[in-house]
Amino acid sequence: MFGALIKKIVGSKNERELRRLWPIVEQINHLEAEISSLSDDQLRNKTTEFKERYARGETLDSLLPEAFAVCREAGKRVLGMRHFDVQLIGGMVLHQGKIAEMKTGEGKTLVATLPSYLNALTGRGVHVITVNDYLARRDSEWMGRIHSFLGLSVGVIIHGLDDDERREAYNADITYGTNNEFGFDYLRDNMKFSLDDYVQRDFHYSIVDEVDSILIDEARTPLIISGPTEDSTDKYYIIDRIIPLLKKGEVLEEEANTLSGKRKRYTGDFTVDEKSKSATLTEEGVLKVEKLLKVDNLYDPRNMETLHHVNQALRAHALFKLDVDYVVKEGEVLIVDEFTGRLMPGRRWSDGLHQAIEAKEGVKIENENQTLATITFQNYFRMYEKLSGMTGTADTEAEEFHKIYKLDVVVIPTNRVLLRPDFPDVIYKTEGEKFNAVIEEIRELHAKGQPVLVGTISIEKSEVLSELLKRQGIPHNVLNAKQHEREAEIVAQGGRKGMITIATNMAGRGTDILLGGNADAMAKQWRRGNPEASDGEYERVLAQFKEQCANEHDEVVKLGGLHILGTERHESRRIDNQLRGRSGRQGDPGSSRFYLSLQDDLLRIFGSERVAKIMDMLKIEEGEAITHGLITKAIENAQRKVEAHNFEIRKHLIEYDDVMNKQREVIYAQRREILAGEGIRESFLDMVDETVADLAAGYAIDKVPAQEWDWQGMGDSIYKIFGFQVDIPAETMERLNPFNLRELLQEKVRELYTAKVAEFGDELMDHLIKVIMLQSIDTQWKDHLLSIDHLKEGIGLRGYGQKDPKQEYKKEAYQLFMDMMLRTREEVVEKIFWVQIAREEDVEKMEEQQKRQRLVFNLGDEPEAQQPVTSKKVGRNEPCPCGSGKKYKQCCGK
């Protein structure tokens, strides 16, 4: 109560933040008359003036009012669009490194030009991240006109560009692109053999559009670059044939006299847990699979790979559905993005799951790939010095943004009052009853001409609904992953009179639905059909379309605007809000309502028992609908339960992934140092000395006479690595101790190294060391990633041994990393001392062979996430980031 009183007096945190920014808005408005009086050249010269003032020490914050005023004026002159006051506030929030929540239709794309322009004045680059190539290209061409007018360069990163084109785009003042392309470019750069081949530069400032989709929805999906393995694909077909012979069972609970109270019992051959998306063999199932595959023991270490593929095949059949999770197009399995409904060509599930689904669908199986490089979006975006984001729906996840990413959410007020009523949910007992009611409402609204946007959560459901509408003779458009190419065109006309649009998911569609239709889109479509038409004809047709759309707009407004009809609740309230947000933009009228059934996935998995009890209590008959506060509350509780469950998973995974991320930073930093050629020979000699020291320490035992040391073992190890025989006279051996043995060996090894340098020459030797170091690091890192994957798969079982899996994972991942570093060092030293080169071309051939790898770009199935920290170079006296507790110079920085 006291907190509520304080809030009433001083306002909420969001209100206080907005109050703090309004005086700056007034400053910008005060400058408008002065700035608008400038000529185009004078306005453009302001950019040069700002850059000079920044170079002299003025801060971006002090330049902000003038810079925003200049950018606003450029928008008016170039696009005929003036930034509203609330858009200026949105721009300030983004500049501060926060998330701006702006409702659909409030002009997020235009808002981004303000902080982009201001931060580009530093000359260090600004990255504007969008969710697909279409939006990246559109925004770079559309909003890029403002920046180009003001003298800044604009680039765009989309699929299909070569390295030179990418480098040019990254070197621009402002670069637009997709999150996937930016992430993969980072991984590709860190696999290259020359710094000159890198395309990206420093990570200065990033504005992420649909930030909730990227930092929350895709939090557990790593980007993976992989190379093919040589394994046969026959095993996938063999295992796939036995899966239909297995019977799905269920988990039963029976009373037991144990401390836990109840004991689980399983029926059938396997059980499915839809919450965790897992399928598990029962004891009977294991015996049946062993018999079918003619395997003695599925859990024998030699058969663990077979067990893994059986589990993935189970998941493929029991949990992944055609036209929901993926589609089959032209003999290829294509993933459907569950958050946006888009197809993701070129992306594959990892760890054998994609191959299992290919076997299930009877299409050609592509070889399984081995991970060469991987990163999550969180780990990529946390490298930016300043990160900001925009979305229409972030407030429901404000706590997670703050706790995990230290990003505050500021809700920006709308330019005009929202007039959209959101009607209570209508619930039916069965899906069939629900669809009948949906069709009836669509028919009524269509009869009076009101446009309707129907939201579904899968391609399968959208096609069922489309078929029902066809039977009723109701014309409509379907917008799902299968119609990706027509997406913008369909969305643009979704607000025309009588238009019915079915959409799988509206997240990130990027095109506003204008009541009455979009005249520009209609004119462009006309131009595609009339390519020979003159500019004059085009302008005349555009004017006609504008008049037609304006008249239709007034009619649609009288009919109540765009009606949103949701056919199922998503697991996240935010996705539901994104669908609702397509209506009521910029003060337009609109409405929304969700139709649900007890057979919907959300209610069936997470909340049906409570809802069913309420419906029974209220004596709801079959075919009868209910709209009741208790039901709506129960549904919201189910959604909160799912959101909390997913939040806990992401938070938990962050702690796991932090270990891997620190190790990656160490490896990539080492690669960069090698590529830069800084002290490469000194680094190699340090490796040599450490290898000798380890050998001496391993065989020469203090307080044990030298004659009793394991000279045979020492000699074999020295010969294996350095290629010479240990020959120490008896009188010298008597005087040896571990310290002077090390000195003796180091002296001999240095002599051999000097002879190698004399044989090859300084330049060739340095080049050889560089190539072998990179080869060894890349090979060992690739194997380490595989080891980490295997460790991650089995670490959960440690809980049964009363051990904390998280701590066990950190400890073992650290040990694996240190073992990898040791193997890398020994491999480099051994190769250099044994290598024989006839010509310099041999070294270049080694380098070229390493470069020639067929790479595959995947979205991983393994969940990962990460807490952001500021990335910086590790000092030699700072603690090592691998977690050993040692100084960097004494650990991974050796």
UniProtKB/Swiss-Prot annotation:
Signal peptide: none annotated. Transmembrane segments: none annotated. Zn(2+) binds at C880, C882, C891, C892. Its cofactor is Zn(2+). One of its GO terms (cellular component) is cytosol. Coiled coil: none annotated. ATP binds at Q87, G105, E106, G107, K108, T109, D512. It is an enzyme of class 7 (translocase). May bind 1 zinc ion per subunit. GO terms for biological process: intracellular protein transmembrane transport; protein import; protein targeting; protein transport by the Sec complex. Keywords: ATP-binding, Cell inner membrane, Cell membrane, Cytoplasm, Membrane, Metal-binding, Nucleotide-binding, Protein transport, Translocase, Translocation, Transport, Zinc. It is found in: Cell inner membrane; Cytoplasm. GO terms for molecular function: ATP binding; metal ion binding; protein-exporting ATPase activity. Its main location: membrane. Its EC number is 7.4.2.8. SUPFAM superfamilies: Helical scaffold and wing domains of SecA, P-loop containing nucleoside triphosphate hydrolases, Pre-protein crosslinking domain of SecA. It is a peripheral membrane protein. It catalyses: ATP + H2O + cellular proteinSide 1 = ADP + phosphate + cellular proteinSide 2. Belongs to the SecA family. Part of the Sec protein translocase complex. Interacts with the SecYEG preprotein conducting channel. Has a central role in coupling the hydrolysis of ATP to the transfer of proteins into and across the cell membrane, serving as an ATP-driven molecular motor driving the stepwise translocation of polypeptide chains across the membrane. Monomer and homodimer. Part of the essential Sec protein translocation apparatus which comprises SecA, SecYEG and auxiliary proteins SecDF-YajC and YidC. This is Protein translocase subunit SecA. The gene is secA.
